[in-house]
């Protein structure tokens, strides 16, 4: 049986009225910001269930918008998310949507970076500020954000994934969950891993030196705590 801490029950100290609709939403935005890896020019948020019904009144829209700008749920700037987005040239659109048989506090994001790259993420706020990520760039995942997440973009050829996992083995880092997606033309791929334990500071540099690796993104729990 899972043991619950006090912050799982009463939620974190935050800006806004609801840990599910504000703190959790801001954390979802922060996850998207980190795993997108670039500044965002446009964000479309497809709001499902209770998110769709109450996002304006509970500040869910501000929290999501703050998160993708790198603003935490306990930062007073969350209240100014729209003004800060306008200053940064960030366009945001919120669309009520039926995403199917998913958690009522679910949002699907389509982010377009300033370089024109498209990134998608779907996740839900499950209470007390906790979140669950269910999709990254079209890849089905189940990540909590409570363990480190490694995202790589690399060439789609033999040996690249082996090179990445060899580095993880060298640092004695265990892979808890792994998903890979290939591009339609077979030239590129992306990979998402949930890892166990703390990550050494030199890990990112070591992974970036692997043949075929084009980008390495690391999200640690403290980045969205």
State each model region's role.
Residues 1-6, 37-42:
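Acidic-glycine-rich active-site phosphate/pyrophosphate-binding loop
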Residues 8-9, 27-35, 63, 67, ...:
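Alpha-helical scaffold segments in soluble metabolic enzymes
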Residues 11-29:
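Conserved phosphate/anionic-ligand binding catalytic regions in large, soluble enzymes, centered on
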Residues 15, 31-38, 69-73, 87-91, ...:
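Generic secondary-structure signature for well-ordered alpha-helical cores
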Residues 54-62, 104, 190-197:
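Short glycine/threonine-rich loop-to-helix capping motif typified by GTGT followed
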Residues 86, 91-121:
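C-terminal edge-of-domain segments
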Residues 94-97, 121-225:
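A conserved regulatory-domain signal marking ACT and ACT-like small-molecule sensing domains
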């Amino acid at each position: 049986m899972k043991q619950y801490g006090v912050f799982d029950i009463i939620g974190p100290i935050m800006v806004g009225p609801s840990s599910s609709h504000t703190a959790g939403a801001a954390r979802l935005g922060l996850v998207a910001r980190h795993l997108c890896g670039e500044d965002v020019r446009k964000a479309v948020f497809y709001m499902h269930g209770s998110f769709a019904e109450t996002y304006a009144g509970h500040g869910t829209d501000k929290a999501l918008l703050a998160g993708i700008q790198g603003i935490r749920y306990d930062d007073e700037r969350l209240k100014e998310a729209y003004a800060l987005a306008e200053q940064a040239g960030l366009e945001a659109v919120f669309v009520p949507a039926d995403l199917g048989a998913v958690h009522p506090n679910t949002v699907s994001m389509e982010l377009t970076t300033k370089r024109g790259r498209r990134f998608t993420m779907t996740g839900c706020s499950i209470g007390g500020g906790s979140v669950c990520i269910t999709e990254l760039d079209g890849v089905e995942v189940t990540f909590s954000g409570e363990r480190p997440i490694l995202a790589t973009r690399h060439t789609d050829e033999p040996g690249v994934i082996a090179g990445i996992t060899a580095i993880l083995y060298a640092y004695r880092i265990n892979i808890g969950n792994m998903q890979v997606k290939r591009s339609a033309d077979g030239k590129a791929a992306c990979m998402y891993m949930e890892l166990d334990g703390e990550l050494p500071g030199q890990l990112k540099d070591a992974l970036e030196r692997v043949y075929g690796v084009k980008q390495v993104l690391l999200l640690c729990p403290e980045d969205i705590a």
